[in-house]
From Swiss-Prot:
One of its GO terms (biological process) is DNA replication. GO terms for cellular component: cytoplasm; nucleoid. Belongs to the MukE family. Keywords: Cell cycle, Cell division, Chromosome partition, Cytoplasm, DNA condensation. Residues 225-243 have a biased composition (Acidic residues). Transmembrane segments: none annotated. This is Chromosome partition protein MukE. The gene is mukE. It is found in: Cytoplasm, Nucleoid. Residues 214-243 are annotated as: Disordered. Interacts, and probably forms a ternary complex, with MukF and MukB. The complex formation is stimulated by calcium or magnesium. It comes from the Bacteria. HAMAP family: MukE.
Length: 243
């Protein structure tokens, strides 16, 4: 039995799975959380076993990615066996604003601490307020009630991003204060190659680009078509070999 297991799993992968850190790290990754350098033990664990764990997760049609900024996350393919959730357009936009704030001089001036109100104010400053209100309520008239609902949605978006490891709470639980993690660069990958990262991120915010269920469906269909094409190619090669 042991010999058969060794044929299926490498010694180093077995050591990774047996590590007491694995259950918590695995659960966090599967839940969509990003593991940054500030999680010293978990991050060091992933650094030590990155190759082995990437092979492990590929069996579920996901990849273990280490971003240029150093954080880890699971990137699912369309055929993933691990449940994936889609961020709303507002959540994506809030993420882009967080990336913009991360790049701002204010981050150093404020010791990296921001508030929910600052994110809300920056969102209104950078994006089209009417479009934001319409995203919350198609019949929005710009009333105080509509703005209150938008503020509630922004708070909910920040809570969702906190669970994904994008921000970390500071102080009391309901203080609304937080620091921004490097993982927000998931929303700003396009800015890495730009001459001015903040200007590039500002363009992304104004464009309001986001993944939607329709775009994900198209992605999945493209992947399935690629699989079908590969199967057909293999069949043709088999026919040629037997000819």
């Amino acid at each position: 039995m042991t010999d058969n297991l060794q044929d299926l799993i490498s010694t180093k992968l077995a050591a990774a799975i047996a590590n007491p850190l694995f259950p918590a790290v695995d659960s966090q990754l599967r839940a969509g959380r990003h593991i940054s350098l500030d999680q010293l033990d978990n991050h060091a664990f992933l650094m030590d076993f990155q190759g082995e764990l990437d092979s492990f997760y590929r069996r579920y049609n996901v990849e273990l990615i280490r971003a240029p900024e150093g954080f880890f996350y699971l990137r699912p393919k369309a055929t993933t066996l691990i449940a994936r959730s889609v961020l709303t357009e507002l959540e994506m936009l809030v993420g882009k604003v967080l990336c913009y704030l991360y790049l701002s001089p204010e981050r150093l001036a404020q010791q990296g601490i921001f508030s929910t109100q600052e994110v809300y104010d920056e969102l209104l400053n950078l994006a089209d307020e009417n479009k934001l209100l319409k995203a919350v309520n198609q019949r929005s008239s710009g009333s105080d009630l509509d703005k209150q609902k938008l503020a509630e949605k922004v708070r909910a978006a920040l809570n969702r991003l906190r669970r994904l490891g994008m921000i970390h709470g500071v102080g009391e639980q309901n203080s609304g204060k937080f620091t921004i993690a490097e993982a927000v660069f998931r929303f700003g990958a396009e800015v890495r190659a730009g001459d001015d990262p903040r200007e590039a991120q500002l363009r992304l915010i104004r464009d309001g680009e986001a993944a939607t269920p329709d775009s994900l469906a198209l992605e999945k269909q493209a992947d399935l078509n690629e699989v079908d094409d590969n199967d057909e190619l293999e069949d043709e090669l088999d026919d040629e070999e037997h000819a």
